[in-house]
């Protein structure tokens, strides 16, 4: 949930009863920001990625007079620094809603790319093909990101996040890694070689795993927005849902420990060197062979699986003691999340991780690459495998991922019809519903307007605005209704 402008992140009033209830609950707001890579092949002359991205956004500029806008589902669509189109999902209370919005973003990018491709072919030849990659590393070795956002209670110290959440984020890549083929061979994650700090407020001069820049887009006295940078861009919908849901459950444990002034049980898993641990996890395809130097001076054997087992154990016990956690996610079964989490860990522990190749991106790729190598008698080059790797992530013209889905070799949780619906329909139970309603009304009446995550503004004929500081609140205020009436 990136910020367009300062929109009132500093509260001036005491917490109201509704906000106090939210602080005491386990409810959460989720969001996913995805930067896409762009390239063109088959054209009569070289085509710069930045120019192609601008061509993709020409319809956006024609309508919004900017490369930075919000669409009717409440999500943000914009052209990031350089040549990276970016899509940030609207606020969601549930991982399944965030997943649907993320899938909608893939379709939005595909449509923009294919429209640009049609125009490009009339200029640079019929073979011109626009590729839009939902991955994290381009062919030149440049890295770009997929960032998860979680609304976290303000009373949780940042140091606690670093010590207790980061080991989970690093080791969960067993089932959330997107996989990467390179000259050094195949590894689980795309981002491990590019992240050089554990926690930082910077995003340009360093690449932290968790960003601490304080932009809550909510009441800053009550919440902070946890900006997770370590994750890969997933094509697997199962992996996207699981990374959000399991991280939520770990955060619930951490928050409750903060409320009660107790030990969560996670502190003992803190790494001596998070970056070194991240590299080890990414290169241990078994999930059980790596060993880690811990912050307390000990060495932990058993790889990422051993740490994930401990986190699961604590979460499972916690949910049993706090059944209200189950109602924190409106559309996701917490017990089913725990069952899936246990099964994938057990698969690695038992040496049968390939049974999750229909759910985990890096396992799907490895199975595919191994099969193609065998067909070619082991003579498939690294460059050919890298090409196939890129095709897997191409949401515009890629064939591999779509083929896996059609054949049932990759599990989906949101079908294309549901993803198309999510392009126009925001979640009904967050402030995204109000933003989407405002945008739809303003566009239908050709009104001039602007908005960001916490403010909606009607700019012509009369300037009117409303602040939406509570991301959980989907109920229209009198001020909001007055603005809608002004649009009639």
From Swiss-Prot:
One of its GO terms (biological process) is proteasomal protein catabolic process. ATP binds at residues 76, 89, 453. It catalyses: ATP + [prokaryotic ubiquitin-like protein]-L-glutamate + [protein]-L-lysine = ADP + phosphate + N(6)-([prokaryotic ubiquitin-like protein]-gamma-L-glutamyl)-[protein]-L-lysine. InterPro entries: Pup_ligase (IPR022279), Pup_ligase/deamidase (IPR004347). Pfam families: Pup_ligase. It is an enzyme of class 6 (ligase). Its EC number is 6.3.1.19. Keywords: ATP-binding, Ligase, Magnesium, Metal-binding, Nucleotide-binding, Ubl conjugation pathway. NCBIfam families: pupylate_PafA (TIGR03686). Belongs to the Pup ligase/Pup deamidase family. Pup-conjugating enzyme subfamily. Catalyzes the covalent attachment of the prokaryotic ubiquitin-like protein modifier Pup to the proteasomal substrate proteins, thereby targeting them for proteasomal degradation. This tagging system is termed pupylation. The ligation reaction involves the side-chain carboxylate of the C-terminal glutamate of Pup and the side-chain amino group of a substrate lysine. This is Pup--protein ligase. It comes from Bifidobacterium adolescentis (strain ATCC 15703 / DSM 20083 / NCTC 11814 / E194a).
């Amino acid at each position: 949930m990136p910020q367009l402008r300062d929109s009132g992140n500093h509260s001036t009033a005491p917490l109201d009863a509704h906000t106090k209830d939210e602080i005491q609950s386990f409810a959460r707001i989720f969001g996913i920001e995805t930067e896409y890579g762009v390239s063109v092949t088959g054209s009569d002359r070289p085509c710069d990625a930045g120019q192609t991205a601008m061509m993709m956004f020409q319809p956006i500029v024609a309508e919004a007079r900017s490369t930075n806008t919000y669409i009717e589902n409440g999500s943000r669509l914009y052209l990031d620094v350089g040549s990276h189109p970016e899509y940030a999902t609207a606020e969601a209370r549930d991982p399944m809603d965030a997943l649907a919005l993320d899938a909608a973003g893939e379709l939005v990018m595909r449509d923009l790319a294919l429209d640009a491709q049609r125009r490009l072919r009339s200029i640079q030849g019929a073979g011109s093909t626009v590729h839009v990659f939902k991955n994290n590393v381009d062919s030149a070795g440049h890295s770009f990101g997929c960032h998860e956002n979680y609304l976290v209670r303000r009373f949780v110290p940042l140091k606690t996040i670093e010590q207790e959440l980061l080991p989970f984020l690093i080791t969960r890549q067993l089932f959330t890694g997107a996989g990467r083929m390179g000259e050094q061979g195949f590894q689980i994650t795309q981002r491990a070689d590019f992240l050089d700090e554990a926690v930082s407020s910077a995003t340009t001069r360093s690449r932290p795993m968790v960003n601490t820049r304080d932009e809550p887009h909510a009441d800053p006295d009550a919440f902070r927005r946890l900006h997770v940078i370590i994750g890969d861009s997933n094509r697997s919908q199962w992996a996207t849902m699981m990374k959000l849901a399991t991280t939520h459950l770990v955060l619930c444990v951490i928050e409750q420990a903060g409320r009660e002034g107790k030990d969560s049980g996670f502190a003992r898993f803190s790494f001596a060197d998070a970056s070194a641990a991240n590299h080890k996890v990414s290169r241990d395809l078994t999930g059980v062979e790596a060993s880690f130097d811990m912050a307390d001076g000990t060495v932990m054997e058993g790889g990422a699986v051993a740490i994930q087992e401990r986190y699961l154990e604590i979460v499972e016990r916690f949910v049993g003691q706090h059944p209200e956690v189950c109602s924190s996610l409106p559309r996701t079964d917490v017990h089913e999340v725990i069952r899936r989490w246990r099964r994938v860990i057990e698969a690695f522990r038992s040496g049968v991780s390939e049974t999750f190749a229909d759910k985990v991106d890096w396992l799907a790729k490895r199975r595919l690459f191994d099969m193609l190598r065998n067909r070619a008698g082991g003579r498939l080059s690294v460059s050919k495998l890298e090409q196939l790797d890129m095709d897997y992530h191409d949401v515009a013209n890629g064939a591999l991922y779509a083929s896996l889905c059609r054949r049932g070799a990759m599990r989906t949780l949101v079908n294309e019809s549901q993803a198309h619906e999510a392009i126009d329909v925001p979640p009904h139970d967050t402030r995204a519903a109000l933003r989407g309603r405002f945008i739809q009304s303003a566009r239908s009446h050709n009104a001039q307007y602007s908005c960001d995550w916490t403010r909606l503004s009607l700019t012509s004929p009369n300037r009117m605005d409303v602040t939406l500081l509570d991301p959980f609140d989907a109920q229209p205020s009198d001020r909001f209704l007055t603005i809608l009436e002004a649009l009639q």
